[in-house]
């Protein structure tokens, strides 16, 4: 989210986000920023859900580990998380919704056809 630039108040300069925002303005798509965030975020949530449920369905699987649920803007940029770089919710999914597929007990339904 290039609108988070103002939150960078320490030593890290968000030059990557500055460049992306400038490019979006030049290409006249900045006004669609929230639509892009919502669409890519919804896809990220679906992919996390699919990966976690696939792991849970795997016989004798010992568990799963996620690298990170937050965006990363370090040496490169990876805005792929369901949390922003400050570990705050992007509003893509609630805690309770996430627990439905990544909680202590997750019921899974197996069928040949639905």
Question: Where are these predicted regions, by residue range?
Answer:
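Substrate-binding clefts and catalytic carboxylate motifs of secreted carbohydrate-active enzymes
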Residues: 1-114
């Amino acid at each position: 989210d290039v609108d988070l630039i103002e939150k960078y108040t320490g030593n890290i300069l968000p030059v990557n986000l500055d460049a992306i925002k400038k490019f979006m303005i030049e290409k006249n798509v900045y006004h669609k920023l929230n639509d892009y965030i919502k669409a890519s975020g919804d896809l990220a949530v679906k992919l996390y859900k699919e990966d976690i449920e696939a792991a849970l369905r795997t016989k004798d699987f010992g568990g799963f580990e996620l690298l990170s649920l937050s965006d990363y803007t370090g040496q490169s940029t990876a805005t792929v998380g369901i949390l922003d770089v400050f570990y705050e919710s992007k509003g893509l999914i609630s805690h309770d919704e996430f627990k439905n597929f990544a909680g202590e007990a997750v019921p899974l339904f197996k069928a040949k056809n639905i």
